[in-house]
Amino acid sequence: MVRLREANIQANYFLESKDILPSFFCQGGAKSDWLWSVRLDQQYDCIIIAIGSNELACCTVEQLQDRLNDYSYHLLCHGFTKHVIIMGLWPRKSEIFSLRARLFNKLSRHNMYWHSGILFWDWSRKLTYKFDGAVHLTKNAYRRALKFIISPVQYIFPYNSK
């Protein structure tokens, strides 16, 4: 619990500090091939791939893992970002799906993708908003991604959707 509190403090500090505000790139769609829409002349602290219910319904954990590994390899190895996170909103509540995602996060700590992960949360108005016909992530969603980067162990062992 202490590590989670420290992660909260650090995430708030990063998001509210004007001097060291992290840069984010967020693109929705687990199925869409958006990889080349990342501006290749910029570097990002974190790239978040947001996935909604329609795409999660037809994805398996293995497909998410493959996609995350592909993106991590291309984006991390070529220096475009430091972290790649797949953020699943509106998750399927099956225990086996959650267990396999947790296991993948645990295993990814021991290979080159340790700074990547798959996160799942219940949808809430605090995480997304609609603007110009598109769904965007809020500051709270970025804060959760930062907490994962700062203290990933909190999201590997106890599954908590809040």
Q: In which residue ranges do the predicted regions lie?
A:
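Catalytic nucleophile-elbow at a beta strand-turn-alpha helix junction centered on a G-D-S/GDSL motif
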Residues: 1-9, 28-31
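Alpha-helical cap/lid subdomain in secreted, periplasmic
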Residues: 12-21, 30-162
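Acidic/charged coordination and interface sites in well-structured regions
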Residues: 25
